[in-house]
């Protein structure tokens, strides 16, 4: 019957039947070799599988717990740091260190520091954070309100210090061209708009017909101290045959100063001391060296004084010669008088000797007669 059944099976069914039989035989051999209990391998497999599941579950839960703990820690750190940053920000914002405290101005000479600070529109105790973003605005305000400033830079540090650097092109005075007053800047540029009545705050520059001469003069003039510049009322360019770049200063205190273009800036800083030492108003010559003389002193007067001084010196020399001659004659007369006295005394002495000798002779003769 089996043969008949096998013959009736299809090839695929035969293969499956043989494969199942082989697998059963292998399983039986393995079960006999491992244990006597046929159910033990399955139980151990189940236990192992269960243990593996438990272990994997424990590891998974531990990992999940650890990840949750780390995420909570990270979240706490993030929230804490955010709160600290916010607290520091508000603490800094409302404290004095967030405010402008100090100012420093450099580069100004004619424009006062107080005027610059007023026009820059920055005040003490302004918030640094908002002021830093307005540096360009402050610079524009300063340039608009001060025409004497050519360039300006405003920098604000987080320490509360404001640094202002300016480059001046201030009005130095008025130059006369064709009997008309024009404002002249520090760089030598002349403002085209004329002025009918110049301000007394600035000096007047005369006879500067060439712009190159005017620029050269203003370059040196700007180096003088403000105190000396404020004392200048007028400057004339008055060259001579010998001195091609002579300058004639008229000062507000009544003095007049002669100087040379190349050296007047260095020498004029000593003018206050020279003026204070003068007993009366006069002339100060700074062309060669530095000396002063009274007013009304001209070259002719100087020559006359020099000739009078030479005449006085010659008369003094003549007087000295006369006195020496008189002293010599007096010495000779005294010597002759001494010699005559000695001669007279000698003659009188000889007469006395003769008389005494005559008396002795008469006495002797009388004795002989007796």
Swiss-Prot record:
GO cellular component, one term: plasma membrane
Gene field: divIB
Family: Belongs to the FtsQ/DivIB family. DivIB subfamily.
Protein name: Cell division protein DivIB
Comp. bias regions, Polar residues: 356-370
Cytoplasmic compartment segments: 1-74
Low complexity composition-biased segments: 304-314, 327-342
Annotated spans, Disordered: 1-65, 295-370
